[in-house]
């Protein structure tokens, strides 16, 4: 999985192609003696693109751990539509798949199973965890999900083209 990701990360216009919704984060209110956990949220569906987004998040988290003393945590969010029972039945398998990918990185991962609309639930988890970014398996800023995340509390990152 990392070989295609590595080749994409050597682009000169990487920031332009991955930042889908730019936002400036407001500084948190963590106490100076307390090491604030750095969090990243990944929208995960089990698709190849969402796996690549999780891989990218785990890579960013790994690099962040090397550069900062703070704990770093990746939050994988799988959202089920209660009107589609098949998505509920697949939830455990899909979140297990995410945990397996994280174990390859030896990264810290929290899995979240939510019921509702994807954009609303991703924004909610990002807000609750005071996330640095939401990562998606999208390539374009005009993707319907990206458009719905325009009010997200943090930047939304996609995959490099």
Model-based region annotation:
Residues 1-29, 125-161:
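Gly/Ser-rich helix-loop-strand patches that form or flank binding pockets
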Residues 88-99:
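Short, surface-exposed alpha-helical segments at coil->helix boundaries
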Residues 30-89:
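Small/aliphatic-rich secondary-structure junction motif
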Residues 75-77, 110-114, 157:
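General small-molecule cofactor/ligand-binding pocket signal
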Residues 61, 98-102:
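Conserved hydrophobic residues forming the short capping helix/wall of the S-adenosyl-L-methionine
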């Amino acid at each position: 999985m990392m070989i295609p990701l590595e080749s994409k990360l050597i682009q000169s216009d990487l920031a332009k192609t991955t930042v889908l919704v730019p936002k400036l984060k407001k500084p948190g209110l963590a106490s100076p003696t307390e090491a604030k956990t750095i969090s990243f949220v990944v929208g995960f569906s089990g698709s190849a693109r969402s796996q690549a987004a999780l891989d990218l998040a785990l890579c960013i988290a790994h690099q962040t751990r090397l550069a900062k003393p703070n704990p770093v945590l990746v939050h994988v969010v799988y959202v089920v539509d209660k009107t589609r029972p098949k998505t509920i039945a697949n939830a455990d398998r899909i979140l297990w798949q995410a945990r397996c990918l994280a174990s390859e990185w030896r990264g810290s991962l929290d899995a979240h199973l939510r019921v509702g609309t994807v954009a609303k639930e991703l924004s909610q988890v990002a807000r609750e965890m005071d996330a640095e970014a939401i990562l998606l398996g999208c390539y374009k800023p005009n993707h319907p999900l990206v458009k719905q995340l325009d009010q997200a509390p943090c930047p939304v990152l996609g995959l490099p083209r």
